[in-house]
Amino acid sequence: MARHQRVVLVDTNIILACWRNGAWRALTRGYAVETVEDCVTETQTGFQHRRKEEQVDRAQLVGSLAAPPRAVSDADCAALYVRAPDIYLDQGEKSLWAHALSRADAWVLCGPDRASLRLSVRLGLCERMISLETLLNDVGHSVRGGLKEPFTTKWLSTRLSEYVVLEGGSK
């Protein structure tokens, strides 16, 4: 399968999963990976509860991104809220989606948060969701022992199909 050339927007879950599995370098060398400041901040919380391999070095993270982490305006967050006031997103996902919707270029979003997936269906953007498994496979990187289920292509497809039914739309 040919690797896409769009910007890859990642949430905190993806950053932590890549760090935990030694896949961050493969991801950032294979794609133009970007995120928002709130997701970077979330990677820095809870250090005392994480194993060493899950502790993200902020300078290394920021330095490996294709662009500096984006700050998101209150206006962009408000525009997102108006489109889906009943879907609760964590701060990182909310900022990531607000940023994504403000972009004029082509992008895909990688993040297994269920509310985020539901939002993608609600907004008619589920084709922009991509699994970590797909991204890593496309750059030829395999994770020893495999990825946890929420990072797989099958899991993503199943969840999106469920939300299409719940939202009454078409995938």
Role assignments for model-derived ranges:
Residues 109-110:
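Conserved SAM-binding loop
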Residues 2-105, 114-171:
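Active-site-proximal, substrate-binding regions of enzyme catalytic domains
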